[in-house]
């Protein structure tokens, strides 16, 4: 009798345990096809990217066609997960996506609690003792241990406690976090909202400022800021006033075009005619009557050569040499004036057109580079996916191809083909808008867009972001630069 009771009690206990346990996910195998992403698979299977990565021991979001993945059809019971920030600074937004406003930025290494995971891979987190917001899950590490979801009543108590907290406690929190977090919002916000201070003409350097950060904030290049302020290096100091007016960059090219090309075109024709006609008038006395029939035109035009020396003085060096050679030919030989005029005009026009075209080429090059950098910055924070062509997700060469296409420039699809299609340049020659290439050991395998000062924007495992081309993980794979 006692054995029966024990058996019944044990069976009942097992039944109760089964009904009380969290929902057990049923696993299925998915074979990756071309174009698949972890996020897309997670959506179709009703699970999360983190769950797939944990089930398959994945450390990145990279997957390849033919790869088999174990995928849970149902997400396990809700749980809170403690994670750490892997980025140097991480923007916290009011909603799940880069289109939402930035609340603040938190420093790398900060521990946060993941409350929920959205379908696009973003997490709702709790940080700084109860504050909430949304971050891109790619910038969080999975080192912390998961903890069960707290009961609803306890969550309400925590919220109430924060709202009714005494002023003294609030002041203490501010003092403890001010030094660590004050510079963060400036750097993070200026990367994505550069138009805020666009009308400013100068900037007083504050603690934590860098030339690169200021270039992003005001929408100008690092080279422009250094040029406008006669800086020979990127070192700046607190209190220093820097010129950051963007329109100053367009003044110089226009002045060069106006002073070189038009001046040569206006002065070329009069100089040749005056010199040639003077020689004709000198020799007509020695020629036959047949030649003198053309002389009546000479007195009218011969009165003009007097100002010629001052006119030639204002011309550029190329025109002065041309006129001297023409006069020598006319003195020594009786070369017809038509031939002399033809040769002089040809030389002068060639020089003028060359100068004008060079100025135009420089303007077009600067305009294209600015358009490329502006377009590249629009996609900061977007997710990486193998084979991604944009505009929501990218891989490295898909990103560069998309950005350049928006600027009206066509690139091949792969990083290797893009490398082959560019002109090789040295790092000292590289300018913002050039491409920078890397080789992991099997040929060109990564490409980014150079923005100057040793920085690039690229689509990598952690999404579209800025990276130091000589930094850890990049410098040893750097191949070089290419110009389209």
Curated annotation (Swiss-Prot):
Its EC number is 3.4.-.-. The keyword NAD does not apply. Induction: Present in both exponential and stationary phase (at protein level). Keywords: Hydrolase, Protease, Repeat, Secreted, Signal, Thiol protease. Residues 80-144 form the SH3b domain. Transmembrane segments: none annotated. Belongs to the peptidase C40 family. This is Probable endopeptidase p60. It comes from Listeria monocytogenes serovar 1/2a (strain ATCC BAA-679 / EGD-e).
């Amino acid at each position: 009798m006692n054995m029966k009771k024990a058996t019944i009690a044990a069976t009942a206990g097992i039944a109760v345990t089964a009904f009380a346990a969290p929902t057990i996910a049923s696993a299925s195998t998915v074979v990756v096809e071309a174009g698949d992403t972890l996020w897309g698979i997670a959506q179709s299977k009703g699970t999360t990217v983190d769950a797939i990565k944990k089930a398959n021991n994945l450390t990145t979001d990279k997957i390849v066609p033919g790869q088999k993945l174990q995928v849970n059809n149902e997400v396990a019971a809700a749980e809170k997960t403690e994670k750490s920030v892997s980025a140097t600074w991480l923007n916290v937004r009011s909603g799940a996506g880069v289109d939402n406003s930035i609340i603040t930025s938190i420093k790398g290494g900060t521990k946060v609690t993941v409350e929920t995971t959205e379908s696009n891979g973003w997490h709702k987190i709790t940080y700084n003792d109860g504050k909430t917001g949304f971050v891109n899950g790619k910038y969080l590490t999975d080192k912390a241990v998961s903890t069960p979801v707290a009961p609803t009543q306890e969550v309400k108590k925590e919220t109430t406690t924060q709202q009714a907290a005494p002023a003294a406690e609030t002041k203490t929190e501010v003092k403890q976090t001010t030094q660590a977090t004050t510079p963060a919002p400036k750097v993070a916000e200026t990367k994505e909202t550069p138009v805020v201070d666009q009308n400013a003409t100068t900037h007083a350097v504050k603690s934590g400022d860098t030339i690169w950060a200021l270039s992003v904030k005001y929408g100008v290049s690092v080279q422009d800021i250094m040029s406008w302020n006669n800086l020979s290096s990127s070192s700046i100091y607190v209190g220093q006033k820097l010129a950051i007016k963007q329109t100053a960059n367009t003044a110089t090219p226009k002045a060069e075009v106006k002073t070189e090309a038009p001046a040569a075109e206006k002065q070329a024709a009069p100089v040749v005619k005056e010199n040639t006609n003077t020689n004709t008038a000198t020799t007509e006395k020695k020629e036959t009557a047949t030649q003198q029939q053309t002389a009546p035109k000479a007195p009218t035009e011969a009165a003009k050569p007097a100002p010629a020396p001052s006119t030639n003085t204002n011309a550029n060096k190329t025109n002065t040499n041309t006129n001297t050679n023409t006069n020598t030919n006319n003195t020594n030989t009786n070369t017809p004036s038509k031939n002399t005029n033809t040769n002089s005009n040809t030389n002068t026009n060639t020089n003028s057109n060359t100068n004008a075209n060079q100025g135009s080429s420089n303007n077009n090059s600067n305009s294209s580079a600015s358009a490329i950098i502006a377009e590249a910055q629009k996609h900061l924070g977007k997710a990486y996916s193998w084979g991604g062509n944009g505009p929501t997700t990218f891989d490295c060469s898909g990103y560069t191809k998309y950005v350049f296409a928006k600027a009206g420039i066509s690139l091949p699809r792969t990083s290797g083909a893009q490398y082959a299609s560019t002109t090789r340049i040295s790092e000292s020659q590289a300018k913002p808008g050039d491409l920078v290439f890397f080789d992991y050991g099997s040929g060109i395998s990564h490409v980014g867009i150079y923005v100057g000062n040793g920085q690039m924007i690229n689509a990598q495992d952690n999404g579209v972001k800025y990276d130091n081309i000589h930094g850890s993980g990049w410098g040893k794979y750097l191949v070089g630069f290419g110009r389209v």
